[in-house]
UniProtKB/Swiss-Prot annotation:
One of its GO terms (cellular component) is plasma membrane. Its cofactor is Ca(2+). Residues 390-417 form a coiled coil. Keywords: Calcium, Coiled coil, Lipid transport, Lipid-binding, Membrane, Metal-binding, Nucleus, Repeat, Repressor, Stress response, Transcription, Transcription regulation, Transmembrane, Transmembrane helix, Transport. This is Calcium-dependent lipid-binding protein. Ca(2+) 2 binds at E279, D285, D333, K334, D335. The gene is CLB. It comes from Arabidopsis thaliana. Ca(2+) 3 binds at D335, D339. Residues 66-248, 66-250 form the SMP-LTD domain. The SMP-LTD domain is a barrel-like domain that can bind various types of glycerophospholipids in its interior and mediate their transfer between two adjacent bilayers.
Length: 510
């Protein structure tokens, strides 16, 4: 009896033990599944969602990294960099040199690479963020840092000197957006779109050093190069502008990837008030330049000896992306050599409502970069009338063709020597964008004009660096003419480039 009861007890105990073990494992498994579900749910919550749930008990140590680290990719990039650098050097030279020529500042006759190597230090990818905004595309944002040791020497030629300039201590901080257009054929990518995000703002730091000379040999050279680099980045690479690269030889329509005009901004530059005088004798001769993209820059006529000029000239500018682009207005004093800026202001297009005309009075600033603003004095204001018109499909295609025609006309006139650069501000001819452009060079254009004064007249060069007789002397002459002869000084003329269309023809008067 004792043996049988012992066997039964053992069987019952074993079954109970197995049942208990099975139940415990099932419970642990269900807890793991529930925990995984909770973690998945928490992982999908944003910082704001967690703050709503936790309230005042929200842990400050919780972070939400926007970019994933890719140490493996940095290791691969460092190994491949010598080969990438050598291949990229020719590509950069072939693609950037034409941009330097198109965007070179007035007064510089040549701007090319004398030396170009990318060095031995590879860029570092701080992180990658993969997103999907549109079907058939994969968008990848790359947080890029590069403190390399490239050897970059620019050959700079001006009217007064020729000097090689070395870019040292180059550092690049930017977030690049790379869009892959997917395809159903190997290599499964038909095109790549590359751009730099506007926010955070791309930062390119460097030091300029003259090789075998001095930067002072060409007055204002450092600022000219800074402006050129900044303009190329903003006008060619910074989103919404982009570079579209076909991949794999797959025939595909890339028109959807290219930047297209969204609308046009009709701007009437009405007047300026209480401008800052930059002249020792007489008053400034102000004119205004306006642009959304620096390569499509237009200017008003110059009003002589007036700190409260009234222009009342209208221009039409194409906008590619209303949400990210801005209208920039700069006021200059027309002078011999380099025209001096009196002030500038920027108006975001996102603040405008389509189909509504606004009249705005905007205060002029010494710089758009608040960190560089040293002069806090009032620089006056400028009054604008603005109207944003959104394009339909037909208007969009017509505007795209007009942009091409304008660029071709600018390049043709640059080659003919009528303007010094495609970046020169010009006046618009006719009522539409397709009517063409009349070229009126900036203060550093080329040409010969008659310079009159209240006392005498003469011939002066409109140029940079060597304008011995020009608007500066004509101002003195006009001042003396007004002082001595009164009304006879009204015949004083300003420098007018030959073989050009008068500026007044370019503006629609209101």
């Amino acid at each position: 009896m004792g043996l049988i009861s012992g066997i039964l007890f053992g069987i019952i105990f074993g079954v109970a033990l197995m049942a208990g073990w099975s139940r415990m494992m099932t419970h642990r498994s269900s807890k793991r599944v529930a925990k995984a579900v909770d973690m998945k749910l928490l992982g999908s919550l944003s910082r704001d969602d967690l703050k709503k749930i936790c309230g005042d008990n929200f842990p400050q140590w919780i972070s939400f990294p926007a970019f994933e680290q890719v140490k493996w990719l940095n290791k691969l990039l460092s190994k491949m960099w010598p080969y990438i650098a050598e291949a990229a050097t020719m590509v950069i030279r072939d693609s950037v040199e034409p941009l330097l020529e198109d965007y070179r500042p007035p007064g510089i006759t040549s701007l090319k690479f004398s030396k170009l190597t990318l060095g031995n230090v590879a860029p570092k990818i701080e992180g990658i963020r993969v997103q999907s905004f549109k079907e058939g595309q994969v968008t990848m944002d790359v947080d890029l840092r590069w403190g390399g040791d490239p050897n970059i020497v620019l050959g700079v030629t001006a009217l007064v000197a020729s000097i090689p300039i070395q870019l040292k201590d180059l550092q690049v901080f930017t977030v690049a957006r790379v869009i892959f257009q997917l395809a159903d054929e190997i290599p499964c990518i038909s095109a790549v779109v590359v751009a730099l995000l506007a926010e955070p703002k791309p930062r390119i730091d460097y030091t300029l050093k003259a090789v075998g000379g001095s930067l002072t040999a060409i007055p204002g050279l450092s600022d000219m190069i800074d402006d050129t680099v900044d303009t190329i980045v903003k006008d060619m690479l910074q989103w919404p502008h982009r570079i579209v690269v076909p991949i794999g030889g797959i025939p595909v329509d890339l028109s959807d990837l290219e930047l297209k005009p969204q609308g046009k901004l009709i701007v009437t530059v009405v007047k300026a008030t209480n401008l800052k005088n930059k002249e020792l004798i007489g008053k400034s001769d102000p004119y205004a330049t306006i642009y959304i993209r620096p390569v499509f820059k237009y200017k008003t006529k110059a009003i002589e000896n007036n700190l409260n000029p009234v222009w009342d000239q209208t221009f039409e500018l194409i906008a590619e992306d209303k949400e990210t682009q801005s209208l920039t207005v700069e006021v200059f004093d027309k002078d011999v050599g380099q025209d001096e800026r009196l002030g500038l202001v920027k108006l975001p297009l996102s603040s405008l409502e389509a189909g509504v005309t606004k009249e705005l009075e905007l205060n002029l600033l010494s710089s758009l970069d608040t960190l560089k603003v040293k002069d806090k004095k009032d620089r006056g204001s400028i009054t604008l009338k603005v109207h944003y018109h959104e394009f339909n499909k037909e208007e969009q295609m017509a505007a795209l063709e007009d942009e091409k025609k304008i660029m071709e006309e600018r390049k043709r006139l640059k080659e003919a020597g009528v303007i010094g650069s495609t970046m020169d501000a010009v006046g618009m001819v006719g009522s539409g964008l397709g009517a063409g452009v009349g070229m009126v060079g900036t203060g550093i254009g080329t040409g010969v004009g008659l310079v009159g004064s209240g006392v005498s007249s003469g011939v002066g060069m409109v140029g940079s660096g060597f304008g011995a007789v020009g608007s500066g002397l004509s101002k003195a002459g006009r001042f003396m003419g007004r002082t001595i002869t009164g009304q006879s000084s009204k015949r004083s003329g300003s420098s007018t480039p030959v073989n050009t269309v008068p500026e007044n023809d370019g503006a629609k008067q209101q």
